[in-house]
């Protein structure tokens, strides 16, 4: 046989590469992008008051530079796809895909085929963390192209080295902060400049950096802000979506800076946050007034610090002086707020289909994709709750792009929030159909019909009746009225002005706090995180075990970002090809984790829920950084918090030893 690669002829012209984002933005830099007049991928702004003037009158100004590098998603299942050509010309596509609808859109553009001839199947994915979008769709597109060409099924499964080399990474950030404080510790102004490396292609960096801009000052009141968040194209590995999506980087900077400011102002870490954190009715840096949901920063911070005993233990920190056993002890915490859903990036929506069967079983499908986060379980729980039936009746069908309308991609911790919104709408519609049909036959009013405990009944008035769910379905089919409904949920309106960075970028927020205790071996320098306490207000918790699992997983994944994961890139080439050269946390590295639920049902969410996948990860790095400072007496502005190591395209950065 002939190897496919032997049939490919390559013609390429050597050009001068650019590996540093600053160099890419020089006026005489060669153009690296297919669109645009320069290498500036995006520029997001926040303008509030006169920040420079306010800094001139500040009692204390802290000026710091922070760096984060490239990070690999490290999903267990590599990219892969199988494509079957059908006799009718349709291509049937399976794969490790994060968003089948966008995969269909990409393949349709590549192959110049109509959507109707591309059916992409929605299967659970063996890990994604934001990484199974662009690259995974490209793999599916190659399988589709080959299948179309040879007229036979084609399977492509990536080896780990291929996955490392081709997949996009978390974008490296250089963050320059100048923040002014009053004598009592109140934040007065912030001037922020952030530069991200988008790499050789533009993926989702324009949107992740937008979130960074909207949340660049953390969950605090700052009356004067000038923030510029930019991304540049380079010849490095391309970057894109990763769990946290622009928040972990700025949270690391802000929460590290807040602890340092507290120390220099003679305040405790708790006091400076209480003075500055957002409360009910406060305005954010973008001018959004938080008055339509519960602002619970003080609740989550109090829950975490009391549970871990922060105020009692902070005085026991080593500050560079080893204990008798040769170890250094430290404790730290961090808080955050995170906009739920995709916000003003795009109009967010989701869909659901519910189809009640003659035998009492129920089929349901949604536009939410299962990436291992437990989305299907959450949808089933919500449907069972609204219909008043047992979960065992409900079968969550793995849909295709031909069966359920677009429901948005599984990103931005939007699955539970948007998915349950569509589920509630579909369930309410099918309940109305059932109620109207049964009352027409048995008497009563539709609004008086109750659904609970696998029964449908009217318990008051002259026309009371009671029947099992199975009996109700039999009546529905006798009447030839089909208990089927399509539901949808569209996120409430949001707003954003690109020139000023003003508006309401998200319709609601998740509030979070995490605290960490750690021990450092003073001789070897190794760090062991021993205890983590996490409190998150993500609205109504649909599935408590999965809620806790998401948080535990996010914490351990975030520990890798904080302490060990250092993806080295040389002249645009990734040096690691497997996990022997890229150190992710192991099970033995996991600390004791205590999860505290702070539940304030969200009035703008049909089911009262928000999301937890990304808030779980975005705080542990600054909590560890603050704990590490109290252990060693040295503060680092880089991630990972290793004594040596590269920091993305900026190379080796001198560690701050202040």
Positions of PLM-derived features:
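Structural alpha/beta core scaffold segments of enzyme domains
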Residues: 1-535, 629-632, 645, 649-654
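Amphipathic, heptad-repeat alpha-helical segments used for oligomerization and assembly
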Residues: 245, 410, 414, 598-616
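Active-site "cap" helix and flanking loop/linker of ATP-utilizing ligase/carboxylase catalytic domains
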Residues: 304, 545, 549-581
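A glycine-rich dinucleotide-binding beta-alpha-beta segment and adjacent secondary-structure elements
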Residues: 326-340, 574-593, 602
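Cytochrome P450 core scaffold surrounding the K-helix E-X-X-R motif
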Residues: 539-543
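Membrane-interface anchoring segments and C-terminal beta-barrel signals
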Residues: 640-642, 658
């Amino acid at each position: 046989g002939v190897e496919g690669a032997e049939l490919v002829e390559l013609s390429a012209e050597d050009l001068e590469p650019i590996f540093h984002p600053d160099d890419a933005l020089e006026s005489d830099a060669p153009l690296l992008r297919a669109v645009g007049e320069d290498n500036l991928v995006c520029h997001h702004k926040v303008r509030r008051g006169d920040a420079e003037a306010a800094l001139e009158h500040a009692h204390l100004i802290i000026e710091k530079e922070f760096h984060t590098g490239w990070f690999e998603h490290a999903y267990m299942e590599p990219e892969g796809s199988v494509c079957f050509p059908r006799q009718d010309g349709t291509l049937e596509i399976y794969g490790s895909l994060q968003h089948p609808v966008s995969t269909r859109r990409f393949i349709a553009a590549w192959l110049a085929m109509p959507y109707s001839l591309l059916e992409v199947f929605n299967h659970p994915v063996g890990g994604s963390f934001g990484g199974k979008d662009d690259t995974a769709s490209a793999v599916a597109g190659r399988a589709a192209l080959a299948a179309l060409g040879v007229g036979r099924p084609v399977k492509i499964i990536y080896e780990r080295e291929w996955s490392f080399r081709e997949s996009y990474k978390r974008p490296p950030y250089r963050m320059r902060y100048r923040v002014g404080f009053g004598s009592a510790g109140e934040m007065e102004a912030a001037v922020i400049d952030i530069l991200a490396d988008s790499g050789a292609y533009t993926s989702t960096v324009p949107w992740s950096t937008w979130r960074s801009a909207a949340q660049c000052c953390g969950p605090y009141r700052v009356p004067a802000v000038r923030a510029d968040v930019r991304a540049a194209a380079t010849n490095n590995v391309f970057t894109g979506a990763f769990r946290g999506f622009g928040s972990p980087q700025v949270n690391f900077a802000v929460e590290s800076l807040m602890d340092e400011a507290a120390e220099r102002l003679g305040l405790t870490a708790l006091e400076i946050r209480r003075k500055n954190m957002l409360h009910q009715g406060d305005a954010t840096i973008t001018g959004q007034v938080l008055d339509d949901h519960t602002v619970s920063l003080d609740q989550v911070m109090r829950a975490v610090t009391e549970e871990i005993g922060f105020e009692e233990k902070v005085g026991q920190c080593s500050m560079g002086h080893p204990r008798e056993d040769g170890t250094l002890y430290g404790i730290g915490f961090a808080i955050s707020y995170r906009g739920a859903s995709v916000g003003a990036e795009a109009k967010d929506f989701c869909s659901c289909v519910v189809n009640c069967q003659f035998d009492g079983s129920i089929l349901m499908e949604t536009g939410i994709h299962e990436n291992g986060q437990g989305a299907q379980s959450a949808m089933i729980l919500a449907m069972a709750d609204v219909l008043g039936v047992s979960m065992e009746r409900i079968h969550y069908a793995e849909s295709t792009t031909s069966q359920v309308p677009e429901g948005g991609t599984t990103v931005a911790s939007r699955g539970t929030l948007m998915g349950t919104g569509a589920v509630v709408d579909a369930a309410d519609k099918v309940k109305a159909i059932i109620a109207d049909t049964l009352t027409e036959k048995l008497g009563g009013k539709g609004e008086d019909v109750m659904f609970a405990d696998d029964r449908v009944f009217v318990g008051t008035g002259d026309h009371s009746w009671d029947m099992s769910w199975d009996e109700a379905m039999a009546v529905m089919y006798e009447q030839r009225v089909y208990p089927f409904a399509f539901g949808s949920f569209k996120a409430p309106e949001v707003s954003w002005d690109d020139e000023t960075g003003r508006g309401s970028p998200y319709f609601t927020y998740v509030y979070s706090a995490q605290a960490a205790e750690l021990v450092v071996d003073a001789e070897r320098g190794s760090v062991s995180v021993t205890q983590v306490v996490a409190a998150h207000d993500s609205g109504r918790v649909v599935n408590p075990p999965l809620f806790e699992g998401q948080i535990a997983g996010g914490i351990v994944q975030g520990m890798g970002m904080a302490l060990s994961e250092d993806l080295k890139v040389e002249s645009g080439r990734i040096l690691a090809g497997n996990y022997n050269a890229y150190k992710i946390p192991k099970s033995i590295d996991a600390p004791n984790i205590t999860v505290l639920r702070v539940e304030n049902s969200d009035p703008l969410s049909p089911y009262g829920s928000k999301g937890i996948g990304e808030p779980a990860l975005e705080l542990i790095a600054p909590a560890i950084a603050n704990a590490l400072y109290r252990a060693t007496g040295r503060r680092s502005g880089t991630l990972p918090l290793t004594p040596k190591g590269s920091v993305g395209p900026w190379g080796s950065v001198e560690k701050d030893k202040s």
